[in-house]
């Protein structure tokens, strides 16, 4: 098990975002924060980090539980815990 991983790869492997290219685009637009700091696609993440991801009007806050280089669909949801999901009126 890795101790750190690139943000874009983690989002893809954990299936929080289905494609790494999409994860990269979302991060480049400043729509992902790691521990309260806006993150770039290459930002290293580790277990215990908190992610806030903005998808249009939806905001998802998740805690990283563990890192895996590869994960089957059933295992992917064990890589994180959803802390909060909310909708905003904003749809940028």
UniProtKB/Swiss-Prot annotation:
Keywords from the named record: Protein biosynthesis, RNA-binding, rRNA-binding, tRNA-binding
Coiled coil region boundaries: none
Residues in S4 RNA-binding domain copies: 5-65
Keyword Thylakoid applies: no
GO term, biological process aspect, one: translation
Top-level taxon: Bacteria
SUPFAM superfamilies referenced in this protein's UniProt entry, alphabetically: Alpha-L RNA-binding motif
Pfam families documented for this protein: S4
Any GO MF annotation of the entry: tRNA binding
Its biological purpose: Key component of the ribosome quality control system (RQC), a ribosome-associated complex that mediates the extraction of incompletely synthesized nascent chains from stalled ribosomes and their subsequent degradation. RqcH recruits Ala-charged tRNA, and with RqcP directs the elongation of stalled nascent chains on 50S ribosomal subunits, leading to non-templated C-terminal alanine extensions (Ala tail). The Ala tail promotes nascent chain degradation. RqcP is associated with the translocation-like movement of the peptidyl-tRNA from the A-site into the P-site.
Assembly and interaction partners: Associates with stalled 50S ribosomal subunits. Binds to RqcH, 23S rRNA and the P-site tRNA. Does not require RqcH for association with 50S subunits.
UniProt family annotation: Belongs to the RqcP family.
Protein name per UniProt: RQC P-site tRNA stabilizing factor
Organism field: Listeria monocytogenes serovar 1/2a (strain ATCC BAA-679 / EGD-e)
Organismal lineage: Bacteria, Bacillati, Bacillota, Bacilli, Bacillales
């Amino acid at each position: 098990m890795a101790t750190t991983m690139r943000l874009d790869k983690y989002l893809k492997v954990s299936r929080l975002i289905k494609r790494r290219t999409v994860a990269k685009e979302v991060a480049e637009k400043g729509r992902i924060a790691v521990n309260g700091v806006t993150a770039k696609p290459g930002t290293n993440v580790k277990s215990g980090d908190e992610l806030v991801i903005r998808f249009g009007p939806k905001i998802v806050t998740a805690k990283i539980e563990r890192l895996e280089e590869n994960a089957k669909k059933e295992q992917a949801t064990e890589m994180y815990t959803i802390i909060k999901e909310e909708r905003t009126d904003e749809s940028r």
